[in-house]
Amino acid sequence: MKVLGRSFFWVLFPVLPWAVQAVEHEEVAQRVIKLHRGRGVAAMQSRQWVRDSCRKLSGLLRQKNAVLNKLKTAIGAVEKDVGLSDEEKLFQVHTFEIFQKELNESENSVFQAVYGLQRALQGDYKDVVNMKESSRQRLEALREAAIKEETEYMELLAAEKHQVEALKNMQHQNQSLSMLDEILEDVRKAADRLEEEIEEHAFDDNKSVKGVNFEAVLRVEEEEANSKQNITKREVEDDLGLSMLIDSQNNQYILTKPRDSTIPRADHHFIKDIVTIGMLSLPCGWLCTAIGLPTMFGYIICGVLLGPSGLNSIKSIVQVETLGEFGVFFTLFLVGLEFSPEKLRKVWKISLQGPCYMTLLMIAFGLLWGHLLRIKPTQSVFISTCLSLSSTPLVSRFLMGSARGDKEGDIDYSTVLLGMLVTQDVQLGLFMAVMPTLIQAGASASSSIVVEVLRILVLIGQILFSLAAVFLLCLVIKKYLIGPYYRKLHMESKGNKEILILGISAFIFLMLTVTELLDVSMELGCFLAGALVSSQGPVVTEEIATSIEPIRDFLAIVFFASIGLHVFPTFVAYELTVLVFLTLSVVVMKFLLAALVLSLILPRSSQYIKWIVSAGLAQVSEFSFVLGSRARRAGVISREVYLLILSVTTLSLLLAPVLWRAAITRCVPRPERRSSL
């Protein structure tokens, strides 16, 4: 302990010259002001000030070296002390090493400041690039210093905790404990071991990983009216990690995995967002039902009212959109559940040919208009591909319960439409896989275009191979697995419906995971899961649909509300004329192209359904939001084009129910019309 006391004396000793220097700071400042105003003998005072400063700095460095020697001596004495345990030796040595690091970092900070001042004086104040580079270097230095200081602070906290634990152990050794106290002491030690075992050193493990950047963030606590309550809640949130972080790019973050996993936590922002969406969706959907509009309109309006362009009350936007994706998964599963493989055999050629021809025609028209408007071919291809896709979840809602029995030699429009939408989902996965290569091709020199084309062809071949593997897997599952699996679920779920729901959900997630691993869209996996289950017969289909539909309905509400979060009424109002013209142009073009393609590939007896199918394909898919955001981050499209894509997509989705109802009224016989509207 004497060695420890002497060492802490030497810890405090180097700080004294800095305190003296702080007292003299006022005098130095006055001298600088006089020099600036031309008072006094400038040359003599300047030389004297430099000599004094150098003398003080040299003295501090000598004292620092002396302290380092004392610390080395203290470390050697601790290591030779036979009265200390190995753990206590490591602790004391580590404490001395922390202070050594502090002295070295303080010295480095002085010379870094001098170097920074020298660089600033040598630079040109009119050269913005040079000033930017200097600022970047200072920012990097500050980030590294902050990380080092944070690491040192955590080490000091650990040292303090060790001292407290050592004091507790000493007190327990000097007093007799009751049986209950001994049990609690054993529990405390077991809890400490548990925390050490489950704690992940994510910060230390990732701070040196390549590509990791250090950034300054703001930590925002929830406001409370009462200051005392605010302090108490801040202490609790600081412990529970429920505050919000905001970086310099205005991105907001919340806790995903706490350091201490033994304490249960809940994201109250996300809970409030879901509760708010659920409460506001009811009157919005009710109002749309009362005036004869589809309820999805009300859910989108709910998202608009709560989103950034409305009340801005949704804080966990990413989490809400993620939950909404499950609405897409379950919707497509139920679509596949009503999609008979026998019907698919009848229309598989139409389902494959139609979307491919439509996409090629859209890209051709896009390149033509892009050439006339002097738009880059990469942008033209991307925008055309985005606009060629149609919304599978939306059309699935239109088709719920509208499938009808085929007449002899006739084709059901719902089967054709669903088959084409599934093919478009495959195209979506293909395009998302090819898009990075397409971006590189647009940025590469003309000499490497052939290489990029070959790379795209290789990617297309990989996707086609993945599709073949998926369908082969589906054949195996249908023949050998799905029947025994469902029978086992049915036996175990008698009187316990949750086992059936959980088993079907697990099968959906398994299929979407398989398709995602094979670089095919997860949506296709959900659809195929439904189609495989439907192969067990109508009784099975009805039982599973009855169980899954309530889950689908709630998650679909969240999905359509999340679409409303990306609707910006003010932007639409500013550019209403342009947006309405673009939306009508896109909808009319898609409608006419679909009708043209279907008139060429449909049999004569089924030509009348081309208008209904064309109406179902005339809107733009909500997945253009995802494609647009990726393209904007990659620099393929500008911010203005991205907002135009969002607005045109949203307006086309709002126009889709009107066009669908008009097509059904015009082309479907009256007895079959009610279930389709």
Swiss-Prot record:
Coiled coil ranges: 124-204
Subcellular location: Membrane
Entry keyword annotation includes Acyltransferase: no
Signal sequence, start to end: 1-22
Any GO CC annotation of this UniProt entry: membrane
Record annotation: effect of changing P14L: Found in a patient with cornea guttata with anterior polar cataracts; uncertain significance
Transmembrane feature ranges: 286-306, 317-337, 350-370, 416-436, 456-476, 498-518, 554-574, 578-598, 608-628, 640-660
Membrane topology: Multi-pass membrane protein
Transmembrane keyword on record: yes
InterPro entries, alphabetized: Cation/H_exchanger_TM, KEA4/5/6-like, Na+/solute_symporter_sf
Keywords: Antiport, Coiled coil, Glycoprotein, Ion transport, Membrane, Signal, Transmembrane, Transmembrane helix, Transport
Superkingdom of the organism of origin: Eukaryota
Sites where a glycan is attached: N206, N230
Tissue: Expressed in the cornea, lens capsule and choroid-retinal pigment epithelium (at protein level).
A molecular function (GO) term: potassium:proton antiporter activity
Family to which the UniProt record says this protein belongs: Belongs to the monovalent cation:proton antiporter 2 (CPA2) transporter (TC 2.A.37) family.
Function: Probable Na(+)/H(+) antiporter.
Record protein name field: Transmembrane and coiled-coil domain-containing protein 3
Origin species: Homo sapiens (Human)
Encoding gene per record: TMCO3
